[in-house]
Swiss-Prot record:
Localization in the cell: Cytoplasm
Main localization, broad class: cytoplasm
Residue sites binding Fe cation per the record: H115, H119, D305
Protein residues bound to substrate: L138, V139, S140, G141, G142, D171, G184, N277
Keywords: Acyltransferase, Cytoplasm, Iron, Metal-binding, Transferase, tRNA processing
GO cellular component, one term: cytoplasm
A molecular function (GO) term: N(6)-L-threonylcarbamoyladenine synthase activity
Reactions the enzyme catalyzes: L-threonylcarbamoyladenylate + adenosine(37) in tRNA = N(6)-L-threonylcarbamoyladenosine(37) in tRNA + AMP + H(+)
PANTHER family in the cross-refs: TRNA N6-ADENOSINE THREONYLCARBAMOYLTRANSFERASE, TRNA N6-ADENOSINE THREONYLCARBAMOYLTRANSFERASE, MITOCHONDRIAL
InterPro entries in alphabetical order: ATPase_NBD (IPR043129), Gcp-like_dom (IPR000905), KAE1/TsaD (IPR017861), Peptidase_M22_CS (IPR017860), TsaD (IPR022450)
Protein name: tRNA N6-adenosine threonylcarbamoyltransferase
Length: 347
């Protein structure tokens, strides 16, 4: 069964093709991605209207590229999947519209996929895929959550951010330091030259006794420190970047370890854009190795938004019998969409 996946939730256009035949994890046949980072740099952030227009320009050429790389034709596709949400409404509508139009033209079923489920399952495409059950740390620009995952479609929310996401803390702190967009990777690069102990920054909710996160206070502390430094900021920027990164990573690592202790599980999956952060990987690996915990990540090029994770999630849901294939081509998107029902929140 060939599944074509389309991702267009924010500022990356991704298309991929997987083979979900049989009971094995779907096999990635080909994928292509176009990032809009350069276009949005001039504005210091994502401009939704520009993002939508660029998705329109890119999605069909990327689809043709993916099919050519896989040596398959569109007529051979069995299911067309797309990101239904969460994300930017206009951007989501582009992917949904193209997916439904393609499926209708081909007479094939169409399927909406949850963006976060794609991230959560993306490590199954790695050379070291996880095994159920596991704890997942979903950490990106828009989300920071800890979940217990027993199988495909069974997700229990353990904790989440009550304000800013970790990726947002990276990006906003970088902006306060005058670093270019996207701020997170630039801050991480600069931090390599700095001393993470040079500034004492808060670790919000670190000792709260639950698994929730908060990063708004850290952002405020970075702003206060930047103002305090004044003209000296330029000379101390690397130290402030290192201290900021250390604070964010410290919270993510300790909360993840607390989740592992609470659940008693021995496998941790880290997914989302921030999962590519080298310091986070290093500290998690070291801490988990001491505790006999296996850590699984997506391949680095699949940490950010991509079509492969959408095609994979669709394929895995179909294999698990969680979807009934539909040929109705009216569609709606869900810019706000929780992956876990409220009642699934652990006490």
């Amino acid at each position: 069964m060939l599944v074509l996946g389309i991702e267009s939730s924010c500022d990356e256009t991704g298309v991929a093709l997987v083979d979900a035949g049989g009971s094995e994890v779907p096999r990635l046949l080909s994928h292509a991605l176009f990032s809009q980072i350069q276009m949005h740099q001039a504005y210091g952030g994502v401009v939704p209207e520009l993002a939508s227009r660029d998705h329109i320009r890119r999605v069909l050429p990327l689809t043709r590229q993916v099919m050519a790389q896989a040596g398959r034709s569109l007529a051979q596709v069995d299911v067309v999947a797309y990101t239904r949400g969460p994300g930017l409404a206009g951007a989501l509508l582009v992917g949904a519209g193209v997916a439904c139009a393609l499926a209708a033209a081909l007479g094939k079923p169409v399927m909406g996929v949850h963006h976060l489920e794609g991230h959560l399952l993306s490590p199954f495409l790695s050379a070291d895929p996880p095994v159920f059950p596991f704890v997942a740390l979903l950490v990106s620009g828009g989300h920071t959550q800890l979940m217990r995952v027993d199988r495909v479609g069974s997700y229990e929310l353990l904790g989440e951010t009550i304000d800013d996401a970790a990726g947002e803390a990276f990006d906003k702190s970088a902006k306060l330091m005058g670093l270019p967009y996207p701020g997170g990777p630039h801050l991480a690069d600069l931090a390599r030259q700095g001393d993470g102990t040079a500034f004492k920054l808060p670790r919000p909710l670190l000792h709260s006794g639950d698994l929730d996160f908060s990063f708004a206070g850290l952002k405020t502390a970075v702003l206060t420190q930047a103002k305090k430094l004044g003209p000296e900021l330029e000379n101390r920027k690397a130290d402030l970047a290192a201290a900021t990164q250390a604070a964010i990573v410290d919270v993510l690592v300790k909360k993840s370890l607390a989740a592992m202790a609470q659940t008693g599980l021995k496998r941790l999956v880290v997914a989302g854009g921030v999962g590519a952060n080298a310091l986070l990987r290093s500290q998690l690996n070291a801490a988990c190795q001491q505790r006999g915990i296996r850590v699984h990540y997506p391949e680095l090029h699949l940490c950010t938004d991509n079509g492969a994770m959408i095609a994979l999630a669709a394929g895995m849901r179909l294999q698990a019998g969680l979807e009934t294939l539909q040929r109705g081509y009216t569609f709606d998107v869900k810019p706000r969409w929780s992956l876990t029902p409220t009642v699934a929140r652990s006490a």
